[in-house]
A protein has these predicted regions:
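Extracellular zinc-dependent metalloprotease catalytic-domain scaffold
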Residues: 1-104, 109-257
Length: 257
């Protein structure tokens, strides 16, 4: 983590807690890359608080910045990322107790779930259609286990909401409070084996056993409780804008001496 400013100590601690959570499931190293003469080891995330538009509407912007070059180790996996949040929204999330889970969720997008790295690797199909899906082998296997089924099926990706929500998350109506669905709720928002399996499909070395306990929700129970609804953000929640990353040239990879 590299803090650029605009964050209080509690907010910095939330970013560190989120990074530590992902480090527990991603256990392998990525090849070093050289960026403007600086060696990047694994992933450099720059985080900041800044004034955007006051509470709600635009929470900020988060996602990969520079991707590793194609054809080599760590193909299309991020080398840098940015997490820039509106200071008013940071304060609001801190008060509501959702700050750590929101930052952990957005950090998942920086890492590549289900953003540009997944798309460049051909893992997301049906983008913009009625039924987008994630076709990574390990994620499909974890989805099979969750369904207690014999056959593999592609993992449903969000098919409702605005750009940045649809086609970029696990489907809310299927997975409810899983961390990488489109809306982070009050805790718990488990980081499941499905998400860790998606990381493995991206090319990360992972520890599936470090995932949180999670099971598919009872959709009937959710509907009866009034919790099953279309994927529209509450007006006071706001959105996080995606980034448009750049792929590094092949000579950015640092070879071992």
């Amino acid at each position: 983590m590299e803090f650029l400013g605009g964050l209080n100590e509690a907010q910095k601690a939330a970013f560190t807690t989120a990074a530590d959570r992902w480090v527990k499931v991603i256990v392998g190293d990525l090849p070093d890359v050289s960026v403007n003469g600086r060696i990047i080891d694994d992933l450099l995330i720059r985080a900041e608080g800044t004034s955007i538009d006051g509470p709600g509407v635009i929470l900020g912007q988060a996602g990969p910045g520079l991707l590793r070059p194609p054809g080599g180790p760590g193909e299309f996996l991020p080398a840098t990322g940015i997490m820039s949040f509106d200071t008013d929204d940071l304060a609001s999330m801190q008060t509501k107790g959702t700050l750590v889970d929101v930052i952990t969720h957005e950090m998942g997008h920086v890492i590549g779930l289900i953003t540009s790295p997944a798309r460049k690797k051909g893992l997301v199909k049906g983008i913009g259609g009625d039924n987008p899906v994630f076709r990574g082998q390990q994620a499909q296997e974890e989805y099979r286990k969750l369904r207690d089924a014999d056959e593999l099926k592609p993992v449903p990706v969000e098919n409702e909401g605005e750009p940045g929500t649809r086609d970029a998350h696990w489907r809310e109506k299927v997975f409810a409070n899983e961390l990488m669905t489109g809306f982070v709720k009050q805790a718990p928002n488990p980081l499941s084996r499905l998400t860790v399996g998606g990381l493995q499909d991206l090319g990360y070395v992972v520890d599936l056993d470090a995932a949180d306990d999670y099971s598919l929700p009872s959709l009937l129970a959710l509907a009866e409780e009034g919790e099953l609804r279309t994927h529209i953000a509450p007006i006071d929640v706001g959105i996080v804008l995606p980034t448009i990353p750049t792929v590094l040239p092949s000579d950015s990879l640092v070879t071992a001496a």
